[in-house]
Amino acid sequence: DNASCALWTPDLFGYFLTGERVSEYTIASTGGFLDACRRKADSDILSKIGIRADMFPDIVMPGDFSVPLLPEIKEYTGSKASLVTVPSHDTASAFLAAPSSSEDAIFLSSGTWSIMGVMADEPVLSAEAMEHGFSNEGGAFGRITLIKNIMGLWIEQESRRQWKREGKSY
């Protein structure tokens, strides 16, 4: 009841630097509150869990939002830079940076988790996609990354952690 605005972590840092409250599309799409077709906060979902949709600021696309730093930030840093939104979600940035010019490329981003996906112009909302564990996240240029989370390096990381506890080093 006391909150007036909800910001994702990258957007919160942007707010601290500029005083502007916006919600960058790719990171906003990961929270489960964004209507994948309309690309804005889904008031039906939010109302069911007791959150007001007006708490979420306007969605901005990566690269479409540029605002100067706050005067005190400029003075402290000596910078005349502006903040420009980028794909804040790491997967969206990784997919954007992948060296492929093919429209039908499949991407695999690996770390603790691995995420496999394709770029699409529209969300895939079929029962079949849901049954197979695919989800739609925001991508660069207002596109959709149709993704599936798959096992990454977590098993290897946990195995190494356990072996280290046992005094073994590999």
Model-based region annotation:
Residues 43, 49-63:
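A conserved helix-loop-beta module that forms one wall/lid of the active-site cleft
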Residues 26-28, 53, 141:
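Short glycine-enriched loop/turn motifs at secondary-structure junctions
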Residues 10, 14-35, 58-61, 66:
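Short beta-strand-loop/turn "lid" adjacent to the catalytic site in phosphate-handling enzymes
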Residues 1-8, 14-20, 33-43, 47-48, ...:
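Active-site core segments that coordinate phosphate-bearing ligands/cofactors
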